[in-house]
Amino acid sequence: MAGPVRVNAHITGTVWKIEVKEGDEVAEGQVCVILESMKMEMPVEAPSAGRVEKVHVAEGQAVSEGDVLVTLA
């Protein structure tokens, strides 16, 4: 991997559940965070495999489209 990979929110909503923790190894396509918007749950997947370097959000936190949720190393 060339550098850190950001997992961004693709919608504005609320962090419903965080599926990973710092230090976890994730696969491409693995769900990292589940967002809730308009009573719908929307999974946010890792764009590539890597190790979770930082989780930038907490459950219940409001996020906007484009916000960084997780950074992979």
Language model regions located:
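Short beta-strand-turn/beta-hairpin segments enriched in glycine/proline and small hydrophobics
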Residues: 1-14, 34-47
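Conserved beta-strand segments that form the floor/walls of ligand-binding pockets within enzyme
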Residues: 8-10, 19, 33, 56, ...
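Surface-exposed, flexible loop/turn segments at secondary-structure boundaries
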Residues: 23, 40, 60
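Short hydrophobic beta/alpha edge segments that flank linear recognition/processing sites
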Residues: 27-43, 64-73
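PDZ-domain C-terminal substructure recognizer with occasional recognition of PDZ-binding tails
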Residues: 50, 55-69
